[in-house]
Amino acid sequence: MSNRIAVVPGTFDPVTRGHMDILTRTSRIFNTLYVLVANNPDKTPLLPMHDRVDLVGQALEEYGFPRSEPKCDSESDRNGPIVKIHRFEKGLLVDCCKQLGATVIVRGLISADAHREASMAYANRNMSGIETVFILPDPPLSVVSSSMVRQLIALGGDISPYVPACVTRFFGTHSG
């Protein structure tokens, strides 16, 4: 089987159960998956990059992904996909994909983002030939967003139903 490499970009500010649903399902399709923790010039992040990267790593461990690349001699010796976290701080997403050898961008899709996501997918394909695949979140998770979680944090609400346990712990000890 050829090595199918995909990227899943996002700000992950913070990582949610919706993100983890998309990552888990994407890992069943691709051999190598890069989780691109990105800076978005249109957003002011709640968390600095190093905290977002660390929380994504902790969440991946919580969901049963190994923290580092498995050691094996051949492709057939490996159990499951390789999942790596990559900081994506500036530049074009398609250039990062080329650098990583990825041929597919995977995005979770909720209806509120559909038009914007489709526009970006067309632009990325026109610039580079890299395809975008959309995965619909599990229905109970389709309303979960980092924006909603940030609002709950600001208002002192319970975020535990919407985020991995590591995020709940982080904000339990880092609340303002």
Swiss-Prot record:
The keyword Plastid does not apply. The gene is coaD. Substrate binds at T11, K43, L93, R107. Homohexamer. This is Phosphopantetheine adenylyltransferase. It is found in: Cytoplasm. GO terms for cellular component: cytoplasm. One of its GO terms (biological process) is coenzyme A biosynthetic process. Reversibly transfers an adenylyl group from ATP to 4'-phosphopantetheine, yielding dephospho-CoA (dPCoA) and pyrophosphate. Pfam families: CTP_transf_like (PF01467). Pathway: Cofactor biosynthesis; coenzyme A biosynthesis; CoA from (R)-pantothenate: step 4/5. One of its GO terms (molecular function) is pantetheine-phosphate adenylyltransferase activity. ATP binds at T11, F12, H19, E117, L141, S142, V143, V144, S145, S146, S147. The record marks H19 as: Transition state stabilizer. HAMAP family: PPAT_bact. It comes from Tropheryma whipplei (strain Twist) (Whipple's bacillus). Belongs to the bacterial CoaD family. Its main location: cytoplasm. Its EC number is 2.7.7.3.
